[in-house]
Amino acid sequence: HPDYPNKTRTEVRYKNDPDRWAKFVKFNFGQLSELNKTWKPDLYWFDGDWEQTAEAWDSKGIINLLRSTNPNVIVNSRIQGYGEYATPEQGVPVVRPADKYWELCMTMNDSWGYQHADTNYKTPFMLLRTFVDCLSMGGNLLLDIGPKEDGTIPAEQIAVLKEFGRWTKKHKEAIYETRAGIPCEHFQGYTTLNKAGDILYLYLPYKLSLIHISE
């Protein structure tokens, strides 16, 4: 947008031009209002909030606008202190986030979207372990898919998605409608519990000849 204060290597354009920013905020609210009235999304995923304060974005006003049409709308945390769930990026948190709900955002290689020169793809095994790590702490995994300019998905990404499909289909009981597992001091690995909390699932990354479980 021409009134957005884009950052360059040396300066921030329109930093001291409040009228331009006010015009952008009006435009932003207009776009959100149109989306809300026309399409009524169940979820809004914001990004780039760090470039302005909550007051500058009018984050509270945005939340009120979105919920005026759909009181149950879900909003991610990237709106300067507002929203329902946290979105750490590119690395599993060392400990479970304080937020009740959270979702790790991760790329299959090193880039968001499609970058033809980026061939540094993570293996399906590595990404599945990341997924399980998230599940064990009560989180979700948002895995980036970057289609090419013609709309097709790169073969490397298709291979990852197919592996995820095979694995999740086989182990769906230990994935869907589960919650965070037991503390790591009780089991040195990834775990989840079923909704009732009376079934414990252990994720074993390698085939073992013997598993000893003590009471």
Predicted regions and their residues:
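Mature catalytic domains of secreted/periplasmic carbohydrate-active enzymes
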Residues: 1-210, 214-215
